[in-house]
C-alpha cells in the first residue's frame, strides 16, 4: 500500500481536487493525506487573532467570506444536486462550529480546534467527490488515530494500533482519505503537528502501515539543486539520501518538512516528491541509497544571528563549552553552527526570542560580539572526508564573498558557510555555476 500526501495548492480549487482524484484512482489501494485548501489555515489564524483580541465582529466578517468561497467550490466540484447538498451541509456544519467560538472566551485550546477545520472540510469534500464518481472511498478521521505524547512527540505505537483498527473496519475500500496536520494530544484534546505537519502525518502513517512508498505531491517538480526563485538554471535532483534531504529541508528547501524524513528513514520506506501540475515528471526519490562522491544541492537559511564569545579563560580549560551550551539550553534556543578556537567559540541561532538574556549570561564568561542579518549557505551531498576535491570547489566559488564561519565534519552530508544575507544571491549563483554548471 502507498501513502500519498497532497498539499494545500494541490487541493486549492475544485478543479485541482478533480485532478487529484484522477491521480489517485488507478485501482490500487492507498491512503491519501490531504492538507487544507490553500489559504484556509492562514485565514483561520486571522480569525483566531480577531477572537484573541475580543473582536467577534471582525472574526465573523472573515468567517462569512471564507464560507462563501467554500460554497462556490462546492458548486463547482459536484455534478449532481445530491452531492452539492451534501457538500453544503458539511460546509455549514463546520462554519457554524467555528462561529460558536466567537461567543465565549478564546484560548489556545479553541484556536487549535478552529485550525483543524480546514483539513476536516477539504477531506470531506474530496471524499464526497470520489463517491460521486463511483470510487470506493472512505474517510478515516485522523483524530481517531493520530496522537502525540506528553512531550508533544508523535506516539507511533498508538498510531499504528488505532490506524490498523480503522482500516479493518473498511477492508474493501480502494481509497482511504485522512487529514494531515491535525491530531490529539496526550490529554485527548485537539492539537496539531505544527506547520508542515501534513508531511509528518504521511510519513508516520507510512511507517505505521509499512507502506511500499510515501509520495509527497506539491506544485514543484521535486527538490531542486538550488533555489529557482533566486538562481538561474536550476535542475531537479532525481535521487537523495534521507540525510541529504533532511539537511536540505532544514536549511531552507521548503518543498519538504524536516520532520517528515525520520519515520520513513527508520522504516526504510522511500519517499517520492512529485508535482501535481506535471504528474509524469519523475520528481525526486529519497531513500537510504547514496550516490558516492556527488554534490547534490545548495540551500540557504535566512534570519541567522551569529554570537562570538572570546575568553582567555577558555585556553587549556575544561568545562567552558558546557557552561556556554547550558545557557542556550536554559532558554530553549537551538544552535545551528559552531566553530571553536583556543580562546573563543562562535555559534549561530535562528531563534532570537531570548537573545538579550542569552547575551547577558554569556558576558559572564568573556567578550561577546553579535552579527545579525546573516545567512547559512549549505552545500549538501556525499561529503565523506575521504572524498577529495569538493571542499576546494566550494571554497573557490566563495572566493569573492566574505565568510564569517565555516562548518564541516559534523555531518557527512553538509558543509556550511555563514555569510551576510545581502551576499546570499551572489553566493548561491556562484556555487551553482561552480558545482553544477561547470563554469
What are these regions (language model features)?
Residues 37-38, 220-222, 271, 275-280, ...:
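Glycine-rich beta-alpha junction loops
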Residues 241-287, 291-310:
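A conserved active-site cap/scaffold subdomain adjacent to cofactor or substrate pockets
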Residues 282-439:
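A conserved regulatory-domain signal marking ACT and ACT-like small-molecule sensing domains
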Residues 1-256, 261, 420:
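Nucleotide/pyrophosphate-binding catalytic subdomain
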